[in-house]
Swiss-Prot record:
Residues 33-55 are annotated as: Disordered. This is Protein E7. Gene3D superfamilies: 3.30.160.330. GO terms for cellular component: host cell cytoplasm; host cell nucleus. A zinc finger (unnamed) spans 66-102. Homodimer. Homooligomer. Interacts with host RB1; this interaction induces dissociation of RB1-E2F1 complex thereby disrupting RB1 activity. Interacts with host EP300; this interaction represses EP300 transcriptional activity. Interacts with protein E2; this interaction inhibits E7 oncogenic activity. Interacts with host TMEM173/STING; this interaction impairs the ability of TMEM173/STING to sense cytosolic DNA and promote the production of type I interferon (IFN-alpha and IFN-beta). It comes from Human papillomavirus 45. GO terms for molecular function: DNA binding; DNA-binding transcription factor activity; protein domain specific binding; zinc ion binding.
């Protein structure tokens, strides 16, 4: 600064725009050690993968038809969403229900 007030030329001495045509190398050249396993248990906590906890079962109401008399059957099941999907696949294939009346009379 050469006077009582600074000027823009004194503050900004040299600015050049970045050349956007030159590629920037973003690769990491870090090399890992030969051992695949690292023992990082200094705090006494094991960081091993634990199996996922199963979802809590929920109740589902299923309305279906008797395969003999076409009567309405209402079922209530308690299962996880995954098991309910399996049951749905059985319904779409060969599983059929028989109502209590048809089961005892035929």
């Amino acid at each position: 600064m050469h006077g009582p007030r600074e000027t823009l030329q004194e503050i900004v001495l040299h600015l050049e725009p970045q050349n956007e045509l030159d590629p920037v190398d973003l690769l990491c050249y870090e090399q890992l050690s030969e051992s695949e396993e690292e023992n990082d248990e200094a705090d006494g906590v094991s960081h091993a993968q634990l199996p996922a906890r199963r979802a809590e079962p929920q109740r589902h109401k299923i309305l279906c038809v008797c395969c003999k008399c076409d009567g309405r059957i209402e079922l209530t099941v308690e299962s996880s969403a995954e098991d309910l999907r399996t049951l749905q696949q059985l319904f779409l294939s060969t599983l059929s229900f028989v109502c209590p009346w048809c089961a005892t009379n035929q």
